[in-house]
Amino acid sequence: MKSVKYLCKLCGQTFELPEGTEPVCPICGATGEHIQVVKAAEGNNKYAGTRTEENLRTAFAGESQARNKYTYFASVAKKEGYEQISALFLKTAENEKEHAKLWFKELGELGNTAENLLAAAEGENYEWTDMYDEVAKVADEEGFHDLAEKFRGVALIEKHHEERYRALLNNVKAKAVFEKSEVKVWECRNCGHICVGTKAPETCPVCNHPQSYFEVNCENY
């Protein structure tokens, strides 16, 4: 059965429902103009519209947040001289990353690179156009003006992130990641070999790594 993916513009929740079902955000109950279609999915989420789908999203969010927290905790432990504790925080963070990946894959959220770039761009767009704009207004209303400015500052960063993802997506679609219309300086990300041309070599002549390791050199110093 085909399903449709939606984004709640009020709380940021994404969810899927069988095609033809009236969308209602399972988290905040928003409907109508507050719900945005993200993309149609060819039955890649067998849990669409169920409580289990909500539970999977909750589990994914919890594991993702735990991973970040443990990474921050590791930095504190390292600064305080607890190398072993720092390493264990990082090890556990990697465990949590894999747990989150399990639930993310169950939800059918992993696509190919072009699909992932589009999903990333849409997520960044929501953050800078809706989420941070709204939370900044609330912070101002409640007197937290410094925090409101931080929200707006991060929103500008998210805008740049969206632009970057869309530029990369255009390159992928145009098959212009490793070939350009103009002569470029290419650098091997593995060994640092430099070459000049409109196209990156199929393999690095120095370390034999494949073309996928090449990028346009962008030194700015």
Where are these regions (language model features)?
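Non-heme di-metal
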Residues: 2-221
